[in-house]
Amino acid sequence: MKYEVKPSNQFKKDLKLAAKRGYKIELLTDVVKKLANGETLDPKYKDHPLSGNFGFYRECHIQPDWLLIYEIDGCELILYLTRTGTHSDLF
């Protein structure tokens, strides 16, 4: 199952900041490719749903303090990339 990837404007800004910080963007790209192909992420990524008002989003760890927040729309086959950054950036 292949999902169309749609990054939010905020995600694009977050990605520029991550690159400026020297993060290895290819690590994020690999995770996004797996998600877009409908693959289950390895346990090392600690993929889980968020709670509360953010319950329809999921979060995974690219690195221990580098997160990806995303949403999958299974009906329309869309992977929304919402945010990326550190815990302090996002929460």
Regions found by a protein language model. Give the residues of each.
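A short, surface-exposed loop/turn module that caps and links secondary-structure elements
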Residues: 34-61
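Enriched for short, Lys/Arg-rich terminal
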Residues: 1-4, 10-16, 20-30, 60-67, ...
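Generic detector of short alpha-helix boundary/capping microenvironments
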Residues: 6, 10, 40-43
